[in-house]
Amino acid sequence: MLTYNFENIGSDTLYEYLYKCIKNDIIQGKIKSGEKLPSKRALAKNLAISVITVENAYGQLAAEGYIYSVPKSGFYVVDLRDDKMKNESGLSENRIYSNKLNLTGGKNGYIADFTSNQTEQSAFPFSIWTKTMRAVMNDYQTELMLNPPCGGVMELRQSIADYLKAFRNMTVRPEQIIIGAGTEYLSSLLIQLLGKKLKYSVENPGYHKIAKIYRSMGACYEYIEIEEDGPKVEELEEKEINVIHCSPSHHYPTGIVMPISKRYELLGWVTRKKDRYIIEDEYDSELRLNGKPIPSLQSIDVSGKVIYMNTFSKTLCSTVRISYMVLPDELAERFYRELSFYSCTVSNFEQYTLAQFMNSGSFEKHINRLRNYYQQKRDRILEAFLQGALKTKIKILEEDAGVHFLMKVDTNLSEEEFLDKMKSKGIKLAALSSYYHSSEKKKKYENIYVMNYSFVDCEKMEYVAKMITQVE
């Protein structure tokens, strides 16, 4: 009987993950050609999943030519090694080999993918960015050939410091700013800097990758429950946490904006013991659509215990891997003393280009355009959803900050069944419960879905609304 582990399936639904697992086993020869697959009911019982999940997985495998159905008998594996079969199906040895590792990634064929954090082509300032790159090539030829300092090119760090002062009221020196290719890289540096003896915390529900980074670095961590106003401070004390990673401006995925009272409560917690720190992750704070930004923790911290982290991946595009962290003075001095042997992971060319883009005022203009763009996009999506029969079937939550909102669906289906049904219609969703670590708490978030809308086509929203309406 086929057996698979469903604990770490990422953003896939059960049916998609099951389909990928079976396909991989067929390609690698673990399931032999001509072998009969278990019946849908038997496999569902063995894996403790629904029959419809197995049915959808088998249907996808059959559609792609990996298995075939014999009436009143079941599903059998196609002989992929047979020359005749290869010619008829178009499968070459190269394709079979490349598929062995193709469990995730690649271009998807969804009509609407609400799990993607990519940026639409029309939202990126190509002409200005290209013009800036040309200017850098002409004006910085000597600088482009030099190795950058470990913390990054000083010109970009000064540009970021000026930007933070103007728009977040943060007074920082450029020497406190460390540039890196992605927050994952910067997080690994932080763990080395703060030490693995400290205990770190991960928000629950929260961003899965944070826990994976701590685990891969061998750091000790605990999950901290997120309340209606942010992390549970009493739990930080109970679990003897030293370092909390949080997103006060816009928690992902709940969308909670931490009120100023909770921010001061966290600052009170961090000052009570010596080896305590707050990592403030403001990954999409610039994209707050309504109201003025609430002050950052770093801007109201007087104890030097807040490490501020941000990225340009949300404001420019996901493939621009430029992030930065602002270290308190004491940690900055320790960084240069202990970790200055690390080379900056962002090229000089990218750093000077971004610095010039910011210094010219183009970044500020781009942010303003981007806010308007996403606000109009969000309004169009909500307009399509909140009319007709669908209006009584869903409830929209936390729609004012960032480029995602939550959607609660009134349905008799389980989450698994609803996700599979949507996937069969070309609509990819992620359940809020999938971001929760503890299975007994997931019921609280039943049938609430995280709707990332940065990469969806507004023209397809009427179709999406119609498909959701049809689900019982």
Where are these regions (language model features)?
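N-terminal basic, amphipathic alpha-helical segments
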Residues: 1-134, 330, 340-347, 355-358, ...
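Hydrophobic residues at beta-strand termini and immediately following loops
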Residues: 114, 180, 224, 309, ...
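Conserved core of the PLP fold type I
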Residues: 133, 143-275, 286, 292-300, ...
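General small-molecule cofactor/ligand-binding pocket signal
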Residues: 178, 220-224, 307, 397, ...
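Proline-centered loop/turn at the N-terminus of a beta-strand
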Residues: 199, 242, 277, 305-307, ...
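Walker B catalytic acidic pair
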Residues: 281-282
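Catalytic cores of nucleotide-enabled group-transfer and carboxylate-activating enzymes in metabolic
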Residues: 295-296, 336, 354, 385
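Conserved core segment of the aminotransferase class I/II
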Residues: 302-372
